Curated annotation (Swiss-Prot):
<feature type="binding site">
    <location>
        <position position="19"/>
    </location>
    <ligand>
        <name>a metal cation</name>
    </ligand>
</feature>
<keyword id="KW-1015">Disulfide bond</keyword>
<comment type="similarity">
    <text>Belongs to the class-I pyridine nucleotide-disulfide oxidoreductase family.</text>
</comment>
<keyword id="KW-0285">Flavoprotein</keyword>
<feature type="binding site">
    <location>
        <position position="545"/>
    </location>
    <ligand>
        <name>Hg(2+)</name>
    </ligand>
</feature>
<dbReference type="InterPro" id="IPR036163">
    <property type="entry name" value="HMA_dom_sf"/>
</dbReference>
<dbReference type="GO" id="GO:0050660">
    <property type="term" value="F:flavin adenine dinucleotide binding"/>
</dbReference>
<dbReference type="InterPro" id="IPR036188">
    <property type="entry name" value="FAD/NAD-bd_sf"/>
</dbReference>
<dbReference type="Pfam" id="PF02852">
    <property type="entry name" value="Pyr_redox_dim"/>
</dbReference>
<keyword id="KW-0475">Mercuric resistance</keyword>
<keyword id="KW-0521">NADP</keyword>
<keyword id="KW-0560">Oxidoreductase</keyword>
<feature type="binding site">
    <location>
        <position position="397"/>
    </location>
    <ligand>
        <name>FAD</name>
    </ligand>
</feature>
<feature type="domain" description="HMA">
    <location>
        <begin position="5"/>
        <end position="70"/>
    </location>
</feature>
<keyword id="KW-0676">Redox-active center</keyword>
<feature type="binding site">
    <location>
        <position position="96"/>
    </location>
    <ligand>
        <name>FAD</name>
    </ligand>
</feature>
<dbReference type="Pfam" id="PF00403">
    <property type="entry name" value="HMA"/>
</dbReference>
Length: 547
């Protein structure tokens, strides 16, 4: 290395500017280092040297300070000493596919390893089939009951669950082939191995092939994108019963007369309402209240909506024992004994990391078994990245896909970070729940002084025209700047308007700037404008579409 030659390193494991300061101090303590500039947001270190300093000495100093490190290449399409990079991708869901396609686009060769069905959770046993089932249940509900029953006769529908299931799974198969299998089959730069991967060391995995035998796959970079599976709580007797997780519930060939649901996760609530609308008597056992971590008004609104539909919500209730005999589940609770024909357990999802032998590669996980990554999807082990539900990031397929794309860019020598400050989230109950940014309580915990306004839907013309005014829109603004920092919505179409709020937050708009925008009349998203106007005026005193 010549005098004053800058050397760039990629640093993993930093979580704040204080970490960057520790890395800088470690590097500047190496003899021959004149100056080190370390950036936490970029996860990089730029080192100015005086004379010859071995790269290994710099790496050793960073590792000794508790962080991961590897030399950084700045090429847009990465090469490895002039050779094509080989990237191993473990998994085939949203994160895995996004990474594989972006890596190939930038010149890499990819080996994708999948132990089960191509496509991962979302298309096969998650988002897609659940939303189809929820939509079918919504149609059944409207035929049974709607705001227009005075002029349109309501007729109790006949539910043919087998036919609905055939329709649902046909669309699942269609999307899996179109968006996953077909794309992989048509890409010569991607080799698919069917089998289970386990790390041999930090540069190779052993694949136990589904059709027998094993293969060692060497890699320059590796992405772990193995997703998550339903978590099962350690309730005495539960594992000895034929309980459902969401996987079994979504492909059930019949609708149970009585369904008990353990958990109040997003999956629990979505499927509880769907089964209720398809004919089940549903009882939810919630350890706390619904939407415990969100604004309290959200949980109150959904609890009221569920109870109005005949769904029994038992708050602060846990099963202490589960038994199954003669085709019936018996749950012991603090409220007495609960009997059901089927039991759905939906208490959350656990990362699929236990069988990967991550310790052989030196990859760190947290107490929940999730792989710890930085904003660039780097693990603490050089050359190994992770994305999606197996990491400590939010478990949404769009987050996983974005993470996979950025991981590929970083693997290939680029610099891309995943910014989740304006990440929208939607729960597909009815009414839907959609959030983005800060709640008032979260802002308070971060020391941000806020001003909030809540607009009930009886002030939104579209809701009035629909004769469905259940719900609200709440805006959270920063005091002083007036900048919008959070939005919470409970509304039948909450998911269709939350991205507008996310863009407003991303672009650092004030509530006044939002109030001044043009919104089409008689749309639900117009409610955002009306909510913004409540910061300075009484919207009840405005004409229908006052600007």
């Amino acid at each position: 290395m010549t005098e004053n030659a800058p050397t760039e390193l990629a640093i993993t494991g930093m979580t704040c500017d204080g970490c960057a300061a520790h890395v800088r101090k470690a590097l500047e303590g190496v003899p021959g280092v004149r100056e080190a500039q370390v950036s936490y947001p970029d996860a990089t270190a730029r080192v100015v040297l005086e004379g010859e300093v071995p790269m290994q000495r710099l790496i050793k100093a960073v590792v000794a300070s508790g962080y991961g490190v590897h030399p950084r290449s700045d090429g847009a399409s990465s090469t490895n000493d002039g050779q094509e990079l080989h990237i191993a991708v473990i998994g085939s869901g949203g994160a895995a596919m996004a990474c594989a396609l972006k890596a190939v686009e930038r010149g890499a060769r990819v080996t994708l390893i999948e132990r089960s069905t191509i496509g991962g959770t979302c298309v096969n046993i998650g988002c897609v089939p659940s939303k189809i089932m929820i939509r079918a249940a919504h149609i059944a509900h409207l035929r049974r009951e709607s705001p227009f029953d005075g002029g349109i006769q309501a007729v109790a529908p006949t539910i043919q669950r087998t036919a609905l299931l055939v329709q649902q799974q046909a669309r699942v198969d269609e999307l899996r082939h179109a968006k996953y299998e077909g794309i992989l089959d048509g890409n010569p730069a991607i080799t698919v191995l069917r089998g289970e991967a386990r790390f041999k060391d930090s540069r190779s995995v052993v694949v136990h092939l589904n059709d027998g035998g094993e293969r060692v796959v060497m890699f320059d970079r590796c992405l772990v994108a193995t997703g998550a599976s339903p978590a099962v709580p350690p309730i005495p007797g539960l594992k000895d019963t034929p309980y459902w997780t969401s996987t079994e519930g979504l492909v059930s060939e019949s609708i149970p007369e009585r369904l008990a649901v353990i958990g109040s996760s997003v999956v629990a609530l979505e499927l509880a309402q769907a089964f209720a609308r398809l004919g089940s008597h549903v009882t939810i056992l919630a350890r706390g209240t619904l939407f415990l971590r969100e604004d309290p008004a959200i949980g109150e609104a959904i609890t009221a909506a569920f109870r109005a539909e005949g769904i029994e919500v038992l708050e602060h209730t846990q099963a202490s024992q589960v038994a199954y005999a003669d085709g019936e589940f018996v749950l012991a609770t603090g409220h007495g004994e609960l009997r059901a024909d089927k039991l759905l357990v939906a208490t959350g999802r656990a990362p699929n990391t236990r069988r990967l032998n991550l310790e052989a590669a030196g990859v760190a996980i947290n107490a929940q078994g999730a792989i710890v990554i930085d904003q660039g999807m780097r693990t603490n082990s050089p050359n190994i990245y992770a994305a999606g539900d197996c990491t400590d990031q939010p478990q949404f397929v769009y987050v996983a896909a974005a993470a996979g794309t950025r991981a590929a860019i970083n693997m290939m020598g680029g610099s891309a970070a995943l910014d989740l400050t304006a990440m929208p989230a939607v729960v597909f109950t009815d009414p839907q729940v959609a959030t983005v940014g800060y709640s008032g309580a979260e802002a308070h915990r971060d020391g941000i002084e806020t001003d909030s306004r809540t607009l009930t839907l009886d002030n939104v013309p579209r809701a009035l025209a629909n004769f469905n005014t259940r719900g609200f829109i709440k805006l959270v603004a920063e005091v002083g700047s007036g900048r919008l920092i959070g939005v919470q919505v409970v509304a039948p179409e909450a998911g269709e308007l939350i991205q507008t709020a996310a863009l407003a937050i991303r672009n650092r708009m004030t509530v006044q700037e939002l109030a001044d925008q043009l919104f089409p009349y008689l749309t639900m998203v117009e409610g955002l404008k009306l909510a913004a106007q409540t910061f300075t005026r009484d919207v009840k005193q405005l004409s229908c579409c006052a600007g």
